[in-house]
Amino acid sequence: MLAKRIIPCLDVRDGQVVKGVQFRNHEIIGDIVPLAKRYAEEGADELVFYDITASSDGRVVDKSWVSRVAEVIDIPFCVAGGIKSLEDAAKILSFGADKISINSPALADPTLITRLADRFGVQCIVVGIDTWYDAETGKYHVNQYTGDESRTRVTQWETLDWVQEVQKRGAGEIVLNMMNQDGVRNGYDLEQLKKVREVCHIPLIASGGAGTMEHFLEAFRDADVDGALAASVFHKQIINIGELKAYLATQGVEIRIC
């Protein structure tokens, strides 16, 4: 069995790490490189960086910090933000990123997933899915351009359909960003994760809602996700990664202990 992964997420805007609640009202957390270094030293299995306004601004992720991160950490990291071409991806990988993640550009042009996978290998290609539960309809819908609340829009895709579509097109991993839970720290949406797990046959990463160590355990034990991504509990030092992993190990979760 592959070890489960603990993945801090760093949302980047204007060269700073920021964090919002339900993808809104972002506050500045701090500088990118020191935070990345701290998480690597605490025992993170990998890091994910989202340039949250790159797609909505119509630009590729600002690459100036990618090589600086690569110099100070020795764990894999993934970069996302406005990657719309093979050239965009090649540049980011050449600066030292191990994976690239696409979200809004994949919705705009699903063939991009296949072209990236063919060029760089499926192991490099992550698809992020921003999913919102509509209580009125009881359905999960995929959202686009979520980095800018004034431009965020609901797409025609229901989440489970899009999960299956991106797999067919060559995604190597899916990060499921559950927008209703984002930043509120009351637990991952286990019901949604279980539904996605049933149709997702590639690595699945849960994102949105972690507030306690038990929330991570529930995601691994009850929804069988491959990794759990979190931001605010790590940024605000509510949970220490090393202590979290020790706890998970005592609960029988296969985890890499530093």
UniProtKB/Swiss-Prot annotation:
Gene3D superfamilies registered for this protein in UniProt: Aldolase class I (3.20.20.70)
Principal subcellular localisation of the protein: cytoplasm
Pathway where this protein functions: Amino-acid biosynthesis; L-histidine biosynthesis; L-histidine from 5-phospho-alpha-D-ribose 1-diphosphate: step 5/9
Active site (record annotation): D11, D130
GO biological process terms, semicolon-separated: L-histidine biosynthetic process
Cysteines engaged in disulfide bonds, as pairs: none
Domain of life: Bacteria
A GO cellular component entry from the record: cytoplasm
Location relative to the cell: Cytoplasm
Reaction catalysed by this enzyme: 5-[(5-phospho-1-deoxy-D-ribulos-1-ylimino)methylamino]-1-(5-phospho-beta-D-ribosyl)imidazole-4-carboxamide + L-glutamine = D-erythro-1-(imidazol-4-yl)glycerol 3-phosphate + 5-amino-1-(5-phospho-beta-D-ribosyl)imidazole-4-carboxamide + L-glutamate + H(+)
Function: IGPS catalyzes the conversion of PRFAR and glutamine to IGP, AICAR and glutamate. The HisF subunit catalyzes the cyclization activity that produces IGP and AICAR from PRFAR using the ammonia provided by the HisH subunit.
HAMAP family in UniProt: HisF (MF_01013)
Protein name, entry field: Imidazole glycerol phosphate synthase subunit HisF
Organism: Shigella dysenteriae serotype 1 (strain Sd197)
Name of the encoding gene: hisF
